[in-house]
């Protein structure tokens, strides 16, 4: 596939073609995802759980993120690389700039920040300095201790109204993409229609502009044995990891994944 840029993703949204994203942490899987046609590789702080064995993403450092971004870059030829700013890496505007620079210099094309309206100043600062930003809303794993666990967000009308307003405000602040996690399908559809930038979902129904899953989850690999409702094991019925990756891309593009059973109601 040709090199994927923000312009590519914006064009896919306008054409109504679904965007495919998977987490990726190393060169070998970056190459495999390229071969399968995955358009965005998310170097996520989820590596703290699936690679390092922690029970949350909080222990992950910016240095560790930069290491994995560089690894993915070496195996990547076509996909856009999106990198998480880990826990407290954007606690101040100065830290936001410094840590974003480390990830971009390691090979990221875009950084992702978790939160809500309070992110506006950070997003504006980065966008003005040439750093594209994806705003991660809904269930934000870095805030798991405040949220009281990994729970669906936006189910009551006040939360839903605030999330819609925040999404529009973050777009106006300069966010180039949104990621909605564990949000009622109807609310995710409304937000996707309300903003001009691409919206990627995970546990957010089928009406977002694209989908993302944790690589290990969609390959049926789990330390805990707990499988989130929004996950499908794409290794089932396949004879290789490469076939599973291609099946994921095919099903997202065809809008057969996610199904109703993978989403949440209000």
From Swiss-Prot:
Its EC number is 2.1.2.11. It is an enzyme of class 2 (transferase). Pfam families: Pantoate_transf. The active site is at 181 (proton acceptor). GO terms for molecular function: 3-methyl-2-oxobutanoate hydroxymethyltransferase activity; magnesium ion binding. It catalyses: 3-methyl-2-oxobutanoate + (6R)-5,10-methylene-5,6,7,8-tetrahydrofolate + H2O = 2-dehydropantoate + (6S)-5,6,7,8-tetrahydrofolate. It comes from the Bacteria. Mg(2+) binds at residues 45, 84, 114. Its main location: cytoplasm. GO terms for biological process: pantothenate biosynthetic process. It is found in: Cytoplasm. InterPro entries: Pantoate_hydroxy_MeTrfase, Pyrv/PenolPyrv_kinase-like_dom, Pyrv_kinase-like_dom_sf. One of its GO terms (cellular component) is cytoplasm. Pathway: Cofactor biosynthesis; (R)-pantothenate biosynthesis; (R)-pantoate from 3-methyl-2-oxobutanoate: step 1/2. Binds 1 Mg(2+) ion per subunit. Belongs to the PanB family. Homodecamer; pentamer of dimers. Catalyzes the reversible reaction in which hydroxymethyl group from 5,10-methylenetetrahydrofolate is transferred onto alpha-ketoisovalerate to form ketopantoate. This is 3-methyl-2-oxobutanoate hydroxymethyltransferase. The gene is panB.
């Amino acid at each position: 596939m040709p090199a994927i840029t923000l312009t590519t993703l914006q064009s896919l949204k306008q054409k109504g073609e679904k965007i495919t994203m998977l987490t990726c942490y190393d060169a070998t899987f970056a190459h495999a995802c390229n071969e399968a046609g995955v358009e965005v590789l998310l170097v996520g702080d989820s590596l703290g759980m699936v690679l390092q064995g922690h029970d949350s993403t909080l222990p992950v450092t910016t240095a560790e993120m930069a290491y994995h971004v560089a690894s993915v870059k070496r195996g990547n030829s076509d996909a856009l690389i999106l990198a998480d700013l880990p826990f407290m890496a954007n606690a101040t505007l100065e830290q936001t700039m410094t840590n974003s620079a480390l990830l971009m210099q390691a090979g990221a094309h875009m950084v992702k920040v978790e939160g809500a309206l309070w992110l506006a100043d950070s997003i504006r600062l980065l966008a003005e300095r040439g750093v594209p930003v994806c705003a991660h809303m809904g269930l934000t794993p870095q805030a798991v201790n405040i949220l009281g666990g990994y729970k669906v967000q936006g189910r009551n009308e006040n939360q839903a109204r605030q999330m819609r307003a925040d999404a529009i405000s973050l777009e106006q602040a300069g966010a180039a993409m949104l990621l909605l996690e564990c949000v009622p399908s109807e609310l995710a559809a409304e937000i996707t229609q309300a903003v001009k930038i691409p919206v990627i979902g995970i546990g957010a129904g089928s009406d977002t502009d694209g989908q993302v899953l944790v690589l290990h989850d969609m390959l049926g690999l789990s330390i805990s044995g707990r499988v989130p409702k929004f996950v499908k094991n794409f290794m089932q019925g396949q004879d290789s990891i490469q076939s599973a990756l291609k099946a994921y891309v095919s099903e997202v593009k065809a809008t057969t994944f996610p199904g109703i059973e993978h989403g949440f109601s209000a």
